[in-house]
């Protein structure tokens, strides 16, 4: 399986905290192994995401990246491919098979404020999840779902403290005290 990382552009403390947190959690839940945050360095947000990942299992990483183009360029220099999610790109459902056929690791770039043209130019694919304005969280979730062929439903996260057991009614949560 390909390695998927996410790059969140231009985080702003206070204004973007909730949406960036949701981008991080969505990345993790849908199979990414790491997220890079650019913009303002938000230690509290990063610690909250690490804490959530620790409690719910897996090896998800979060890293601050002052220079987002440095992340993109290094990714490409190491043979990786870049997918930039934008409402102006090729339709996700039409391009995802091409992305899947690539044997390269994938960096998904999710915008914040106005995305500079150099991000569009550096992307191997500019990808749209519909051609309508909506949330970067929903774009990320839909694209990762397509990229994973729905296999994110079968992901197992190692050493969780909390583990939800699917049930039609009520809540069923296993608590693994040994992982605290």
Curated annotation (Swiss-Prot):
Reactions catalysed according to its record: cytidine(56) in tRNA + S-adenosyl-L-methionine = 2'-O-methylcytidine(56) in tRNA + S-adenosyl-L-homocysteine + H(+)
Keyword annotations: Cytoplasm, Methyltransferase, S-adenosyl-L-methionine, Transferase, tRNA processing
Compartments in which it is found: Cytoplasm
GO molecular function, one term: tRNA (cytidine(56)-2'-O)-methyltransferase activity
Positions with a binding annotation for S-adenosyl-L-methionine: 85
Chief site of localization: cytoplasm
Signal peptide positions (record): none
Source organism, top-level taxon: Archaea
Disulfide cysteine pairs (residue numbers): none
GO cellular component terms, A-Z: cytoplasm
Any single Pfam family the record assigns to this protein: Trm56
InterPro entries named in the record: Alpha/beta_knot_MTases, tRNA_m1G_MTases_N, tRNA_mtfrase_aTrm56
Enzyme Commission number: 2.1.1.206
GO biological process: tRNA nucleoside ribose methylation
Family: Belongs to the aTrm56 family.
HAMAP family linked to this entry: tRNA_methyltr_aTrm56 (MF_00077)
Entry-linked PANTHER family: TRNA (CYTIDINE(56)-2'-O)-METHYLTRANSFERASE
Function: Specifically catalyzes the AdoMet-dependent 2'-O-ribose methylation of cytidine at position 56 in tRNAs.
Quaternary data: Homodimer.
Protein name: tRNA (cytidine(56)-2'-O)-methyltransferase
Organism: Methanobrevibacter smithii (strain ATCC 35061 / DSM 861 / OCM 144 / PS)
